[in-house]
């Protein structure tokens, strides 16, 4: 079971068993059985599963502006190619928000951390508008650490943001002298592990709206979890994963180096046991070097498959403007709900969702499917 380090706080309990999708709710159907003699018989309670799939949906027009005046009759919904009926429809403004910031603090990000810190502080101040709204902060490099657990306290979150620092090149080299994690490129970047842990250990049991914002160059080095398992963890917990691609033009980081850290004996900490490697045992990644990885495409895939959006910081699209766009989306989403209607309704496994708008020139942003377990 994958865990991460909690700084200055008590560790959260690990989840046990198979993760269940948050879109399944149990309802009790009570049937009173009457006897034929005219005397009331004993009431029998039968529990049945009523599977309600919830979709956070953002709709934009051809100019990229968010559309807010739609009804459920303006959408066409299918699951695995079969038409579905939208039974629940609302705008999500008043639902509680659970928000997570996952900040890449590897060497490749050290020159942009100050800008990220300042913009993140303003973003959290803007998004946490009620006591029911809570946020957490995780940083990841050669380890994954929870700097601030779920809280509605802006002061605690600000303090956690102030503690964000990238490891020094000297420290990374000392931690991994054989350069098994590509320390000259950043000393390990456990992006996939961070997404997996945030989803399973923090988001899994939270109600209402759930979103994570990643600030990274998108290149993973050393995660125990795969890209696919990270995406699946977010999908199973109904978590939107927004990505902000922020690269330092003065850093020579490109390329996806081997997956040394996070595997038994690899570089990086934050995992239980075994020195800086975290996982017990020995050995490093599968290969000393792997092919170049396009971090932008990685972040695009993560966000697309979880129903969110990837943004790229540039001169015309600064990080504070990107945060404003994310805030607007989260405030103006529609919430659609339906009960799957088909022969094998709610069958175990992955179910593909297709949502389209009847009106022309409208684009739909929502998750592409969900997992149903036994």
Regions found by a protein language model. Give the residues of each.
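An N-terminal low-complexity intrinsically disordered segment enriched in acidic/polar residues
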Residues: 16, 20, 28-29, 44
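N-terminal secretory signal peptides that target proteins for export/translocation
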Residues: 1-23
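Residue-level detector of transmembrane insertion/anchoring sites
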Residues: 16, 26-27, 94, 207
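Bacterial N-terminal signal peptides
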Residues: 25-38
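Bacterial Sec-dependent signal peptides at the C-terminal "C-region" and cleavage site
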Residues: 8, 35-44
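Scaffold/interface architecture of coatomer-like assemblies
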Residues: 40-374
């Amino acid at each position: 079971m994958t865990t991460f380090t909690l700084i200055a706080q008590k560790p959260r309990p690990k989840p046990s068993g198979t993760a269940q999708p948050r879109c399944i709710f149990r309802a009790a159907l009570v049937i009173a059985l009457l006897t034929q003699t005219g005397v009331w018989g004993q009431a029998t309670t039968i529990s049945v599963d009523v599977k309600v799939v919830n979709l956070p949906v953002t709709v934009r027009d051809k100019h990229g502006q968010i559309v807010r005046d739609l009804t459920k009759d303006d959408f066409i919904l299918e699951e695995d190619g079969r038409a579905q009926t939208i039974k629940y429809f609302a705008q999500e403004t008043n639902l509680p928000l659970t928000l997570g910031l996952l900040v890449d603090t590897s060497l490749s990000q050290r020159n942009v951390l100050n800008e990220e810190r300042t913009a993140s502080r303003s973003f959290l101040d803007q998004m946490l508008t009620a006591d029911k709204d809570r946020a957490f902060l995780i940083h990841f490099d050669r380890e994954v650490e929870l700097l601030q657990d779920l809280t509605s306290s802006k002061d605690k979150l600000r303090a956690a943001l102030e503690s964000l620092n990238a490891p020094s090149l000297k420290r990374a080299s000392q931690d991994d002298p054989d350069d098994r994690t590509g320390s000259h490129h950043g000393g390990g970047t456990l992006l996939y592990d961070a997404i997996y842990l945030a989803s399973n250990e923090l988001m899994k049991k939270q109600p209402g709206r759930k979103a994570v914002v990643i600030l990274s160059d998108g290149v993973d080095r050393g995660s125990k979890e795969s890209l696919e398992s990270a995406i699946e963890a977010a999908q199973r917990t109904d978590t939107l994963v927004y990505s902000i691609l922020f690269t330092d033009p003065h850093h020579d980081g490109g390329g996806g180096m081997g997956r040394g850290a996070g595997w038994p004996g690899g570089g990086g900490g934050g995992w239980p046991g075994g020195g800086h490697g975290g996982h017990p045992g020995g050995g490093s990644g599968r290969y000393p070097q792997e092919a170049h990885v396009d971090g932008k495409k990685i972040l695009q895939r993560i966000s697309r498959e979880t129903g969110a959006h990837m943004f790229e910081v540039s001169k015309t699209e600064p990080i504070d403007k990107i945060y404003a766009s994310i805030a607007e989306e989260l405030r103006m989403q529609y919430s659609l709900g339906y009960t799957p209607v088909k022969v094998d309704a709610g069958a175990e496994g992955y179910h593909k969702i297709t949502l389209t708008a009847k009106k022309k020139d409208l684009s739909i942003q929502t998750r592409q499917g969900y997992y149903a377990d036994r």
